[in-house]
Amino acid sequence: MSSIIKQLPTVALRGLTILPGMVAHFDVSREKSIKAVEEAMMDEQEIFLLTQKNPEEEEPTAENLYSIGLVAEIKQVIKMPNDLVRVLVEGIERAELNCFTETEEYLLAEVIRFTEDGLEDIPENAREAMIRCLEEKYEQFCTYNSKNGKEAAKPIQEIHELDRLIDTIANSIPIGYEEKQRILEAVTITERYEVLMAILLREIDIATIRNDLAMKIKSKVEKNQREYILREQLKVIREELGEDNTQSDAEQYEESLKKLKAPKEVKERIQKAVSYTHLRAHE
């Protein structure tokens, strides 16, 4: 894998990682970030995006930034209220930070742009197997996580290039920026495939457990509702028969008797007394 070194204005992102092929927007308010966007717009509209390891850091240094970032093309810049600038970008390719060049106004990075050649090393049958596995697992993921179910997975069936398929799926699944950073840092196709598959399998497992728990809770709630309705219906029937609370009291005695710790002979005498009282109540 060869590399090309280039200098690019740089923005440090907080709580956000953008992947190649992804169209996304972010807001910047730090003076250095705004200046970096302005510098990029005056040149080729390319900007280097690095994600902060600690989103709370106000003045991030190289040590507080992930070394693998994204070269992106700025599509639109909008000035917002409160001195915010909203930037719309499209991810072009992953790149690595080599070093920062001294400048007080904004971050200027010397970046190493990768020229990917790992795809040709994967045998055709292996590549096809990887594509089919991704399609299958993504469809399963959509079944659990999308309102449209399997229908949401149909667009990827038109993609037959492994690298493009990986980027498309990675951009469509709702995962945190740290997980996306793992995908971004997987430079070779094989590494990226393995990271994405691990994420998909984990998300499917979580969704399966979540659905099982939801079904158990639903079943329990429905059972409790059925029992409540039956009890209310039985109460109405007893009232109609003039047996308002007598039968209920007898049942309570029966339940208490079962729980009572006493010799069998004592329980039998109590049982006879309860039965006698119940009969007298219906005379």
What are these regions (language model features)?
Residues 1-152:
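Positively charged
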Residues 151-155, 164-167:
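Short amphipathic alpha-helical interface segments
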Residues 25, 62, 66, 148, ...:
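Short, surface-exposed helix-loop/turn micro-motifs enriched in polar/charged residues
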